[in-house]
Swiss-Prot record:
A lipid is attached at G2 (N-myristoyl glycine). Residues 14-33 are annotated as: Interaction with membrane phosphatidylinositol 4,5-bisphosphate and RNA. It comes from Human immunodeficiency virus type 1 group N (isolate YBF30) (HIV-1). Transmembrane segments: none annotated. Residues 7-31 are annotated as: Interaction with Gp41. PROSITE patterns: ZF_CCHC. This is Gag polyprotein. The record marks Y134, P135, L365, A366, F380, A381, N437, F438, F453, P454 as: Cleavage.
Length: 512
């Protein structure tokens, strides 16, 4: 568990593991929270060894408390864990983290020094209303002093420009680094940018346009200024070209103040928006999800391009609600439309999480195959080639259906399966009733039948008795035979048989 796991032992460890993380929750503090707190202290450049005692925890709490208002969630979690650890070291009975924070707050109020006279209290109240934003800091004498930007801040700004060029995330980074800066500080940040001089020239043009517009909307008052009154800043004063650092500080700390630093920042942000638009020529309308692209990557590209769009927040919200679903691939679009128009981004990400995976691809392939097979089946049915349900197989050995003769369990029947006689097979059977094809050959049922062979059915002979004979039928048959013989004699007398060609051609060459 590491060296910091031995901070608590015995009864203190039992008390630590009995405290709930949240009021009414089920999770409690464990040893891993101590290890995490020690690592976080090292990350914040604090001494983890102070966690061993109550006084050390108090020092850490006093050091972290001023950063709670602007700190991250990790910093708040670290402060809460140290507050609980302080109560455990001090043997203060608590049940959850909120009770520990309340105990710490009570102790701080008890040790808070009271003002000696009402005037000091009023002065403290007045000082609390004065802005102490960096880089303008108030001294002990009540004077506002300017502190220039640190090299670390300038280095971070230059590194962002070198790595990100002018991507959409440069603007939030500039806003964070230039918080409370004067126009001179902002010019210092812009002058540290070595490359991208074309972009810097575009930025200067935007600043000049905004300065000219400021001069048109804020004309110079007529007449001399009263003694001791500051002059109104011009556009060039706000840009820091015709004003000194003392004048800028005086404008920013006057009553009422003139925020020349914030105004200049707003002009710079307008110019950066144009530069980002130039460096990101892709329109939000062109961001479409690929057929195999995960929905998460598509959303990342969509919002990154949306940040570069020069539009109001209402227009961006409309783009998100409409184009995000409209430009998705057909698979994701079908799922997103099923969610409805009021779906959140988390619900969309969850619904489209499996799209593009192996399971989804297999399902899509199965649906495509089924759609291809359906029209093929209908075509065969229309042409008459669709046989429908197959006839059940029949055994030639026992005559039952459901199996073949080679799988029949009945005793093997010998001989021909057609006539029952032995000595030949069914394909060689020559008994009467055998069908023949148009070539006169016997047709075997195991071979294909010619398509032009008419199918005949075997009919049974009638069982009625034969007709009675009265004598005239035999006479009629004999008379027919005599007439046929007389006709043949007549034909022979008219056309004698030609034994040679002499009667036709005279001398027959063949007889010579």
């Amino acid at each position: 568990m590491g060296a910091r796991a031995s901070v608590l032992t015995g009864g203190k460890l039992d008390q630590w593991e009995s405290i709930y993380l949240r009021p009414g929750g089920k999770k409690k503090y464990r040893m891993k929270h101590l290890v995490w707190a020690s690592r976080e202290l090292e990350r914040f450049a604090c001494n983890p060894g102070l966690m061993d005692t109550a006084d050390g925890c108090a020092k850490l709490l006093n050091q972290l408390e001023p950063a709670l208002k602007t700190g991250s969630e990790e910093l708040r979690s670290l402060y809460n864990a140290l507050a609980v650890l302080y109560c455990v070291h001090s043997r203060i009975q608590i049940h959850n983290t909120q009770e520990a924070l309340d105990k710490i707050k009570e102790k701080q109020e008890q040790h808070k020094p009271e003002p000696k006279n009402p005037e000091a209290g009023a002065a403290a109240a007045t000082d609390s209303n004065i802005s102490r934003n960096y880089p303008l800091v108030q001294t002990a004498q009540g004077q506002m002093v300017h502190q220039p930007l640190t090299p670390r801040t300038l280095n971070a700004w230059v590194k962002v420009i070198e790595e990100k060029a002018f991507s959409p995330e440069v603007i939030p980074m500039f806003m964070a680094l230039s918080e409370g800066a004067t126009p001179s500080d902002l010019n210092t940040m812009l002058n540290t940018v070595g490359g991208h001089q074309a972009a810097m020239q575009m930025l200067k043009e935007v600043i000049n346009e905004e300065a000219a517009d400021w001069d048109r909307t804020h004309p110079v008052p007529v007449g001399p200024l009263p003694p001791g009154q500051l002059r109104d800043p011009r556009g060039s004063d706000i840009a820091g070209t015709t004003s000194t650092l003392a004048e800028q500080v005086a404008w920013m700390t006057a009553n009422p103040p003139v925020p020349v630093g914030d105004i200049y920042r707003r002009w710079i942000v307008l110019g950066l928006n144009r530069i980002v638009r130039m460096y990101s020529p892709v329109s939000i309308l062109e961001i479409k999800q690929g057929p195999k692209e995960p929905f998460r990557d598509y959303v990342d590209r969509f919002y990154k391009t949306l940040r570069a769009e020069q539009a109001t927040q209402e227009v961006k919200n409309w783009m998100t609600e409409t184009l995000l679903v409209q430009n998705a691939n057909p698979d994701c679009k079908q799922l997103l439309k099923a969610l409805g128009p009021g779906a959140t981004l988390e619900e969309m990400m969850t619904a489209c999480q499996g799209v593009g995976g192996p399971a989804h691809k297999a399902r899509v392939l199965a649906e495509a195959m089924s759609q291809v097979q359906q029209p093929t089946t209908s075509v065969f049915a229309q042409r008459g080639n669709f046989k429908g349900i197959r006839k059940p197989i029949k055994c030639f050995n026992c005559g039952k259906e459901g199996h073949l003769a080679r799988n029949c369990k009945a005793p093997r029947r010998g001989g021909c399966w057609k006539c029952g006689q032995e000595g030949h097979q069914m394909k060689d059977c020559k008994n009467e009733g055998r069908q023949a094809n148009f070539l006169g050959k016997s047709w075997s049922p195991f071979k294909g039948r010619p398509g032009n062979f008419p199918q005949t059915t075997t009919r049974k002979e009638p069982t009625a008795p034969p007709l009675e004979s009265y004598g005239f039928q035999e006479e009629k048959s004999t008379q027919g035979k005599e007439m046929q013989e007389n006709q043949e004699r007549t034909e022979n007398s008219l056309y004698p048989p030609l034994t040679s060609l002499r009667s036709l051609f005279g001398n027959d060459p063949s007889s010579q």
